[in-house]
Amino acid sequence: TSARLDRLAPEVIRKCRPRLIIGKGGMSSETSEAMKEVGCAYLAFPGGAAVLAAEALPEVLGVHWSDLGMPEAVWHLRAKDLGPLVVAMDSHGRSLFKEVEDSVRKRSVLL
């Protein structure tokens, strides 16, 4: 999941300045702040939809930092009709993950 690289993400985002990151789970407020600084958004891809991803990613253009292992390496892929994707963290600091977590926390207090 995205959380595995979350501790490195703010520095990588500030140095590489990506426009989009695609993952499954949320990332920290520190990562969200770095994304806001560079105008980056996080798109969530649904877990369990690997067949959709495989069909929409026909070509590997490059692999970077492969010494980190395949799951943590940065993959440069050609995409065609990739989706569904949800803007889960936008470039203004809003996080769907945090909003849902806050909503659940408020409701659990009422119980």
Where are the regions a protein language model picked out?
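Long, charged alpha-helical interface segments
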Residues: 74-111
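Feature captures the catalytic cores and cofactor-binding loops of soluble hydro-lyases/lyases
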Residues: 1-82
